[in-house]
Amino acid sequence: MQSNIELVITDEKVQTRIIADKNILSENFPYFKAMFMYTEGQADYVCLHTQNVQVAHDLIVSCGNTSYKFQDKTWDYIFDLYKCRNFFGLDFIPLVDNTVPPEYIDKLIDTMEIIGYDYSTIKYIAHNLPKDYALNKLSIELLKSIQQILSEFYFLVENRNGLSMFDGVSKMCLKLFEFDFYSVEQMSYCYLNQTNRLVILDTNNILKIFDVQTLNVVAISSGNCFCNSIIYLESKNCIVGINSGGFEIYDAINLKLIGKINGPKQFDYVETSLIGKSSDDKYIIFQQAVETDYGYHYQLMIALVETGEIIGPIYNDKKEFSCICSPTQNIIIYGNYNNFTLWSLDSRSVIAELRLNVDPFKFVFIGFSLDGCYIIFVDSNAIAYIWSIVTKQFIRSNSTISMRNHKNPTYACNSYRQFNKEKFGLNNISILPNNNLVSTKGNCISIWNIMCQEPIESFNLPIDSFMSKIQVITNKRDLANKIRNFINS
């Protein structure tokens, strides 16, 4: 077989020619490997008709090398490149880090359909699909596949060795970031769930964005970020950091400082910590610990991201309290021991008060289900209580929760699930996308159906369990819930 061959590449408008080595083509492209096994193996030239001559030329010249930089190419070029790679028998691999703009989503879906739907192409659609996309344009089969991918989750493990991410299904580990043991408490980070990136505020007060697949640093803040914690607002694509003076807002792509919100100044000595955000990213919820002559006084505060208005304190206590934010509604629940209040951020009023008449009066976990329909309480005896947002009742209980204007609140004394305490870890409890509950004991992870006493799955992660913090990372919750509701409607 002759070594060289002339490739005559044409599309509807232009033509180009490439002199290439058959052996190199066969090694890098399954299409040419199969071609040269037949009569074309003895040919001097071959004619190829493609959709885009320039794209085919670049792909052949680069020998299909995915390290070639495509960041400066147009989206039309990128989509033609995906089709061309598929034509030459190459696997689908996302070639750019940027999120596909909304105006190109239909073309993205058409391109993936031409390539063929499999896990990699559907995952690419799922990670780029806007939450306001018209779902009736997609088939139910495709929506179910997207929903399944959006239900995937990861374990983000923080310990004295650094940060590691584990796939929730395969349990495969990806080492992300290493830092000194003594700086653990100074680290703050948040996960950008639509781009598969991690933002870290390091001990030098510098923000960095890491691609969790390549481990590359894709952006660094130009100045210092003097914040003690950060959070990601997906709908605004920005990072919000908090400190005693207020808030700093950074662009989530290039980490440029784009705004500030001044905090309340009525106290001289105050520690401010971030709690969370509302489901629509309009509100930031934070706690202030005010130092007095008699110790600390704890306050629950709200900030409006758009206007910078500070609301509160909406709750005061001499003891530390818990507060969590609903993933789907603009409501929060706060309190301590066995007294909790459900509060609306939009109406700025109490929705309901919960009294859990249980012993001991100590809860190690309070969380919303990811569909926002239930609140789950777990106490130090591994007993779980589930309260419905819709019915304002504990599951399997006839006792409704009283509203604030009711004189005699009712209690949840017979509505509980008792987990196997020998297997149930009281640290790092989280809710999974399927509303199962995950707990850790040492480096053993157990996944529980909330109605069952025994775990449905247990496995060990290869981690140093000393001082480990494990966080469950999920994909686009809003879009996953929207697809679920659309399919069920």
Curated annotation (Swiss-Prot):
Transmembrane segments: none annotated. Disulfide bonds: none annotated. Residues 3-73 form the BTB domain. SUPFAM superfamilies: Quinoprotein alcohol dehydrogenase-like. Gene3D superfamilies: YVTN repeat-like/Quinoprotein amine dehydrogenase. InterPro entries: Quinoprotein_ADH-like_sf (IPR011047), WD40/YVTN_repeat-like_dom_sf (IPR015943). Belongs to the mimivirus BTB/WD family. This is Putative BTB/POZ domain-containing protein R773. It comes from Acanthamoeba polyphaga mimivirus (APMV).
